[in-house]
Amino acid sequence: MALQKFPLMGLLLLLTILVSVTTAVDDPVCPATSKLSRASFPNGFLFGTATAAFQVEGAINETCRGPALWDIYCRRNPERCSGDHADVAVDFFHRYKEDIQLMKNLNTDAFRLSIAWSRIFPHGRKEKGVSQAGVQFYHELIDELLKNGIVPFVTVFHWDTPQDLEDEYGGFLSQNIVKDFREYADYVFTEYGGKVKNWITFNEPWVFAHAGYDLGKKAPGRCSRYVPGCEDREGQSGKEAYLVSHNLLNAHAEAVEVFRQKVKGGKIGIAHSPAWFEPHDLKDSNDAPTVSRVLDFMLGWHLEPTTSGDYPQIMKDLLGYRLPQFTAAQKAKLKDSTDFVGLNYYTSTFSNYNEKPDPSKPSWKQDSLVSWEPKNVDHSAIGSMPLTAALPVYAKGFRKLLKYIKDKYANPEIMIMENGYGDKLGTTDSVDVGTADHNRKYYLQRHLLAMNEAICIDKVRVTGYFVWSLLDNFEWQDGYKNRFGLYYVDFKNNLTRYEKESAKYYKDFLAQGVRPSALKRDEL
């Protein structure tokens, strides 16, 4: 009755209720807990582990699987893959049922996998043949996950371009890849979309483009000869990476158009892989802007087109004609073409203003006018660097990066698609040493706490977290010498899996929680 007498007051009350409902939906709600555990996170938060087809499956001659880019790259250039290859990898193809039981043992909710393009289309295109045995393998894998109560998250492309497309037109160097990727994505969405609702089109496009076509550290190893280590290579640093990314982004947009037609109630995104940066010298006015600039080049390069429809302005300003342009139609397809931001976070470093770039030797890193420094102006390293660590450990950077994405990109939903710690054990590698991975345990503890603070204090909308990786596996140019798994794989003894200390910690964390964390905030 009162609302009839005071319509304006009633309208204001209604708006207040609507705003409150919206806020409740958008902002994460964290339970009050006395110890860090699964219970410290919002209801429905997903915890899982991650792998990628090429890194774990093996079975390269089964199901009529065609050769992939990394197969040929490692055969032709064994020294670029630490003398290793992924012909067998960790034999996930034959052992996935056993490995799914390891996931259950961890108490995880979800599992991130990728589909090998050439296991579906051995020659890259549907018209050249479909491997029904390959199609069936992924059906059986997905069904086994679902039977065990584990939600599948599927990556359409994790760096394994069919070699036939590389040979035919240069893979992602050609715009022909756009229609071929759309066809492949259409097929897997149609085939598996009824039971898989969470998808990633591309894994780490920055790494794929920069390391593969500018730095030459990953397949196909293209770079200019002035780049250290590239004296005998083919490629054009400072150009090809931008072309590859342009084609990749257009391929993503085409795939998402199909996805939204075919997969009802699904979500799709890209898994980005930025580091966090701290200014090299806080007193230098040139260093502070380097953080946002390098993040525009590293993260915004592929994220901003999927939100706004175009590249970051700073990239257009600094690169000029070397940065391809989207057409109006391409911009329209790219804009708002993700439902969440996928984030892979491992480490942080310092950013320093690069005052004297060499215009005769363009490269992605030089283009951003930023140099990366392991120590700041006071000669202090970032975070900590355990003796066998592959990368510096800096959990503060994780929280800062999450807050940065929230603030810059309008508070999107974020899924942590990879977070993990690499061990290079060298001559000390053994089952006993490898399973006593206390540094990985501490890494996970610190990063889970940092993520919890980002969610509960900074109100970042993180909804899932995947540890990289379930198993030690083939780590690209490092071969099997860099171990990231929660389970140790004995490469000398039948690929036997052994539970590591980090797996025990994660299992307890996801079960009933762990003892109250003794970590202090300044230790992060």
Curated annotation (Swiss-Prot):
Record's keyword terms, sorted: Disulfide bond, Endoplasmic reticulum, Glycoprotein, Glycosidase, Hydrolase, Signal
Coiled-coil region: none
A matching Pfam family: Glyco_hydro_1
Active-site residue numbers: 204, 418
Description of activity control: Activated upon binding to PBP1 or PBP2.
Enzyme nomenclature, EC number: 3.2.1.21
Tissue localization of expression: Expressed exclusively in roots.
SUPFAM superfamilies: (Trans)glycosidases
Signal peptide start-end: 1-24
Keyword hit for Zinc-finger: no
Subunit record text: Component of the PYK10 complex, at least composed of PYK10/BGLU23, BGLU21, BGLU22, JAL22, JAL23, PBP1/JAL30, PBP2/JAL31, JAL32, JAL33, JAL34, JAL35, GLL22 and GLL23.
Protein name: Beta-glucosidase 21
